[in-house]
């Protein structure tokens, strides 16, 4: 089930731009799937998690590591924010992004701290996998 961004003033990824001008442009429209770098893809994937845009998450996951399906957020999950700790480009086609995503589930606060790996193939960035920190 797709949701609408909760705040028209700011994107779910934490940038001060409105969703359509930030991650929304990678989720649909002329720039669909065209995030220009790994950090932009990471932010757009976080927003897709917040908004339950499962098709986008699967399409931006590298085919070699992509699951066959994803489950939508449980009803008691509330995403609270994203912090990019580091973003490094190893070469033209490989990058890492370290992030902390905060969420609350069943009233309990949780942090997901991950170092994610990305690869660029045929002019598109893909999430490959990550190490939980």
Curated annotation (Swiss-Prot):
Record Pfam families: YchJ_M-like
Similarity remark: Belongs to the UPF0225 family.
Name of this chain's protein: UPF0225 protein BP2036
């Amino acid at each position: 089930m797709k949701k609408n961004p909760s705040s028209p003033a700011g994107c779910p990824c934490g940038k001060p731009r409105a969703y359509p001008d930030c991650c929304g442009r990678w989720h649909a429209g002329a720039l669909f799937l065209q995030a220009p770098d790994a950090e932009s893809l990471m932010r757009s994937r976080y927003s897709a998690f917040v908004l339950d845009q499962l098709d986008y998450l699967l399409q931006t996951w590298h085919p070699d590591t992509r699951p066959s399906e994803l489950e939508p957020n449980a009803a008691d999950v509330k995403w609270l924010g994203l912090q990019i700790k580091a973003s490094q480009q190893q070469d033209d086609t490989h990058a890492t992004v370290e992030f902390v995503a905060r969420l609350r589930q069943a009233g309990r606060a949780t942090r997901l701290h991950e170092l994610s790996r990305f690869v660029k193939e045929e002019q598109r960035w893909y999430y490959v996998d990550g190490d939980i920190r």
